[in-house]
Each structure stands twice: as C-alpha cells, then as structure tokens.
Curated annotation (Swiss-Prot):
This is DNA-directed RNA polymerase subunit omega. Keywords: DNA-directed RNA polymerase, Nucleotidyltransferase, Transcription, Transferase. It catalyses: RNA(n) + a ribonucleoside 5'-triphosphate = RNA(n+1) + diphosphate. Promotes RNA polymerase assembly. Latches the N- and C-terminal regions of the beta' subunit thereby facilitating its interaction with the beta and alpha subunits. Belongs to the RNA polymerase subunit omega family.
Length: 92
C-alpha cells in the first residue's frame, strides 16, 4: 500500500488547517453518509481515501459545498413532495 503524503494534499488545498477540515468532511461523507469514493479504496480507511482524493484534486472545499447544497435541495424537494401528497390526501 502506498503511503499518502499529507504534504501533497496540503499543497492542493493551500494550508494544513483547511486540508484537515476538507479531509474530515469528505471522510465523514464516505463513512457515515455512504457516498461513493472517487478513487479505489484499496482497503484504506475513509480518512486515507479522502486524502488521496484531495491529493488528486478530486475534492476541494468548493466541491464539498456544492455537493452539500445539492443534497439539501434534494432533501427539501422530497419533503415538499411528501407534504403535497399529504395535503392532497386530506383534500380528497
């Protein structure tokens, strides 16, 4: 297994602190939310996968923000559809 160098990920993000935040958000997406990794997992833990994705330039703070906004929009649309279905059921 090749070692992930944190320095490569830091260089992609800009500074060590932002890199930690981005890696933690992405690792949480993979581990908890069930998001698919953009690289081969190779039996690595979600944090290592997140660092590899950052290193390859696949994940940035902007891509995570856009993904989060899309998820919120989809969730809100589903809630509105559910409320509309309930309202239609009461009217009938």
């Amino acid at each position: 297994m090749a070692r992930v160098t944190v320095e490569d990920a830091v260089n992609k993000i800009g500074n060590r602190f932002d890199m930690i935040l981005v890696a933690a958000r992405r690792a949480r997406q993979i581990a908890v939310q069930g998001k698919e990794p953009m690289v081969d997992e190779m039996n690595d833990k979600p944090t290592v996968v997140a660092l590899r994705e950052i290193e390859l330039g696949l994940v940035t703070s902007n891509t995570l923000d856009a993904d989060e906004r899309q998820t919120v929009r989809e969730r809100e649309a589903a809630e509105i559809a559910a409320v509309a279905a309930i309202a239609e059921g009461r009217v009938l």
